[in-house]
From Swiss-Prot:
It holds the Pfam family Glycos_trans_3N. Its EC number is 2.4.2.57. It comes from the Archaea. The keyword Transferase applies. It catalyses: AMP + phosphate = alpha-D-ribose 1,5-bisphosphate + adenine; CMP + phosphate = cytosine + alpha-D-ribose 1,5-bisphosphate; UMP + phosphate = alpha-D-ribose 1,5-bisphosphate + uracil. Catalyzes the conversion of AMP and phosphate to adenine and ribose 1,5-bisphosphate (R15P). Exhibits phosphorylase activity toward CMP and UMP in addition to AMP. Functions in an archaeal AMP degradation pathway, together with R15P isomerase and RubisCO. PANTHER family: THYMIDINE PHOSPHORYLASE. One of its GO terms (biological process) is AMP catabolic process. It comes from Methanococcus maripaludis (strain C5 / ATCC BAA-1333). The active site is at D258 (proton donor). This is AMP phosphorylase. Keywords: Glycosyltransferase, Transferase. It is an enzyme of class 2 (transferase). One of its GO terms (cellular component) is cytosol.
Amino acid sequence: MLFLNAKFIDLDLGENAVIVNEEDLKGTSYYPQDRVLIESHAGSVIGNIYSTKTMVNKGEVGMLVSELAEISISEGEEVKLRHAEKPESIPFIKKKMDGQVLNPHEIRTIIDEIVSKKLSNIELSAFVSSTYINGMNMDEISEMTKRIAETGDMIAWEKSLVVDIHSIGGVPGNKYALLSIPILAAAGITVPKTSSRAITSPAGTADVMEVLTNVELKEEEIKRIVKTTNGCLAWGGGVNLAPADDIIINVERPVSIDPQPQLLASVMAKKIATGIKYTVIDIPVGKGVKIKNEAEGAKLARKFIELGESLNIKVECVLTYGGQPLGRAIGPALEAREAIEALQDPKNAPKSLIEKALSLAGILLELGGAAQIGEGQNLAWEILESGKALEKFNQIITEQGGTPKKPEEIELGDYVEEILAPIDGYITDISNTAITNVVKEAGAPRDKKAGILLNSKIGNKVKQGDVLYTIYSGSEERLVSAINLARRVYPVKVEGMLIERISKF
């Protein structure tokens, strides 16, 4: 047992950690990465030991911001460190690593220990990897979904009909929600949209919306905003909705994986937590996204529908074209600009963005009773073209604490590079994977001003020297890295009409 004085450390490691001077560890049974219980007069918290020579003095224990807040410790206060018991879920994680089926108790224990931070990032990574490799059956996924939802707040609504649209993501520039949500809200449909930040893409809906307004809303704020406007566009992590999901996402993000069991549970847990009764799930299909073909998409759709039935949520899925970025803008600020431009002048907006936003909104207008079957997309267009969707979007921005902006008022990165066509020809491919990696290299989504603006799409004719796309970054170093990567992976490919000359010589 160790008695040390707490020292404030302004550091976020994504897990609970205690930093101890190596002199205090000598001659003890404590080693780096050991799990310990930190106790004070106000409570206790579990963390993993990290040793240091200089960060804290002998007799001190460095504690992170989240830990100090969790048990209300004052800096300099004496705390007690002792060995913590191994988490109950460790053998259950090993069981899943061996490809076995987990029972409800085992699944609930794993989720509970994720939320209570009893599992280290290494242990959590093992669980995520095991579900990525070995998968889960529907009973396991349903149990995990319910428990993830139960670990956080649950929002109840006065209205019985509450709807939502959700995309499984993977498509760069997937900003459709900034059009679809205000269209639905303008039609009188209750649509409290909560989104995650980017996992595998350069910008999630929450990242894009954060360029324009506050997305970290509490439950009562969401209720107030939705009561006033019929809709919102918020980050799910700010509301303590399904907190286990956000912890899992933080482990998935560095390796850009989104295991299908976690994907299903993540999406549907948020629907339970936000009181959704009807939801449309967008499943992009194509090269460089999560789902490669229509057969895979249909299989996933059936899983969503089956999971929804077990949770009493009506689910309708749509397979959408995901073979290239949606619209021309990729990256938070650029996507926010393009969304506002589309709301202001939909006739001149990218057709792919308009068509997707209208299609998804149209389905929910029909499910919500605002339009007859087959007429939803027409009503969605009327709302968009009339300016009512823009008006509603600006109202949502204002209610969430922002100020409506013109597209040109949204700042982009100061460091800019235009990438030119090397030859005359046609654009034959735009790689989602390469575009995503280049935009991330430029700094997105953390750097909101970073991104790529495409000048042309697949099938367009270009001449040598034409601008194919422009890279933006808030950092000169990041821009150089993005340019170097782009030169290696060729996000946009141009080919002439003559592919190859073949003769017998």
